[in-house]
Amino acid sequence: MPDIEYLKKLALIGAVNKTVKVSSSEFHKHTGDSSKTAARKLKQLEKERLIERELVPGGQLIKMTEKGIEILKNEYVEYSRIFSSEPDTLELEGNVLKGLGEGQYYINIPGYRTQFEEKLHFIPFPGTLNVQLSENSSALRNRLREMPSVRIDGFNDGERTFGGGNCYPVRVEGIDAAVVVPDRTHYPSDLIEIIAPVKLRDALKLKDGDRVVTQLKKQGMEGQK
């Protein structure tokens, strides 16, 4: 199990967004451990690929990796659940981002399109709304797996195999829609793709960079996984 406390201390001195220079003799003041223990634990974090570390004269240069940041995001989500009442919906907010056009291609594939219609009860517009989540919402995104979802099965059309994924029922500014999360994706974790029966950009008069709020429902469609 990674040393969460050391990750938190590194984050507090700025190692999330930049490379910081520290020495074991200085860092132990933040943790209360001896310099020797601090050096050993920092080395272990590097071994677990939670930080990047380079020894330099007078100390070491340290920056947290995406893997390390993800662990802290999960901690944030768990503490949020402990100290706040559970809302009926989970809100994710971010900014509209120009897509790569892949959504239109995949939505039009019959093996997917039929499942969307049968399981989501709407025929999706051939395209997705891509939203880059804010920092807070990016952390909360890990809670998607706790929300009701609809399973979209993978299939083979005789020529190639298409992977499966999950759809999470949402409302985007009052419009019923779904967040699509493929089992395999090359997109970063702070990006979500939304499908809807209408072109959301036109219906909500959205352009690149506009802020949009997505509400994930806690009830509904549980029996359709």
Curated annotation (Swiss-Prot):
Binds 1 Mg(2+) ion per subunit. Its cofactor is Mg(2+). Residues 1-89 are annotated as: Unknown. HAMAP family: Riboflavin_kinase (MF_01285). The keyword Flavoprotein applies. Keywords: Flavoprotein, FMN, Kinase, Magnesium, Metal-binding, Nucleotide-binding, Transferase. It catalyses: riboflavin + CTP = CDP + FMN + H(+). It comes from Methanosarcina mazei (strain ATCC BAA-159 / DSM 3647 / Goe1 / Go1 / JCM 11833 / OCM 88) (Methanosarcina frisia). This is Riboflavin kinase. GO terms for biological process: FMN biosynthetic process; riboflavin biosynthetic process. It is an enzyme of class 2 (transferase). PANTHER family: RIBOFLAVIN KINASE. FMN binds at T185, E193. The lineage of its organism: Archaea, Methanobacteriati, Methanobacteriota, Stenosarchaea group, Methanomicrobia.
